[in-house]
Amino acid sequence: MTDRTEAVKAYLLDLQDRICAALEAEDGQALFREDAWQRPAGGGGRTRVIENGALIEKGGVNFSHVFGDSLPPSASAHRPELAGRGFQALGVSLVIHPENPYVPTSHANVRFFSAEKEGEEPVWWFGGGFDLTPYYANEEDCRYWHQVAFDACAPFGAEVYPRFKAWCDRYFHLKHRGEPRGIGGLFFDDLNEWDFDTCFAFMRAIGDAYIQAYLPIVQRRKLTPFGEREREFQAFRRGRYVEFNLVFDRGTLFGLQSGGRTESILMSLPPMVRWGYDWKPEPGSEEARLTEYFLTDRDWLSGA
């Protein structure tokens, strides 16, 4: 393992520790259970899962470092010149599903790839981002989430936030439904256009911004009263989350195709989901407003 890979690994392990500690403190009841695992083909990871807490119904914060002799199809399909190279893949990926429907689901991921071939320089890139999936959305929360994203990107250039915000809107889109998964955030992949140190610094900025973006929203909404109606709508909308993760998500596809650990890969799925045939919310309801107003690709910072 190169010095660069060692530095990335050390950061990711520390990031996992810090995020888990912050979420445990906010929940105040449940603790993460750690499951260290090994991948027979090379590598392993630390899966941490929290369930049935005062705040978090189910959540997972996963670190993985896997390696192998050839990249799986999901990683080389859009870069055929890398086919046949060995690889190192490191990342932290997390999804938090709160019980209260007024607290959004959040997702974050930061990762590093290095495609290697003897006698040649490694081809490396970073990826990651974070995005928010509300059920009963609030404009204040949407603006705040995107403001933290904007601030994290600002030191790296004025064009970075709008570019990666738009990429997030495109990526987290359910093509078969014609709607976004949530209100977006940031998404980037194949990042190697800057030098290594700058790209690594950007990945750290995004990883470090997640707790700053999410916890204030949690704190504002976690005591909002809710009932059976809100829980049923939350379960219905969680179905969209499942559809995206199993059909479109590149991380899920890479993990399954590379022989990753299935329990860790699928830890992002919510615990309770429902599908209703051709179900539609009542016109003018808060449930209808989610799709009519919030689930659109809009500039949340304009006029903010």
UniProtKB/Swiss-Prot annotation:
The keyword Protein transport does not apply. The active site is at H107. Keywords: Cytoplasm, Heme biosynthesis, Metal-binding, Oxidoreductase, Porphyrin biosynthesis. Residues 241-276 are annotated as: Important for dimerization. A divalent metal cation binds at H97, H107, H146, H176. GO terms for molecular function: coproporphyrinogen oxidase activity; metal ion binding; protein homodimerization activity. InterPro entries: Coprogen_oxidase_aer, Coprogen_oxidase_aer_sf, Coprogen_oxidase_CS. Its cofactor is a divalent metal cation. Substrate binds at S93, N109, V110, R111, G259, G260, R261. It catalyses: coproporphyrinogen III + O2 + 2 H(+) = protoporphyrinogen IX + 2 CO2 + 2 H2O. GO terms for biological process: protoporphyrinogen IX biosynthetic process. Its EC number is 1.3.3.3. Pathway: Porphyrin-containing compound metabolism; protoporphyrin-IX biosynthesis; protoporphyrinogen-IX from coproporphyrinogen-III (O2 route): step 1/1. It is found in: Cytoplasm. GO terms for cellular component: cytoplasm. Belongs to the aerobic coproporphyrinogen-III oxidase family. This is Oxygen-dependent coproporphyrinogen-III oxidase. It comes from Ectopseudomonas mendocina (strain ymp) (Pseudomonas mendocina).
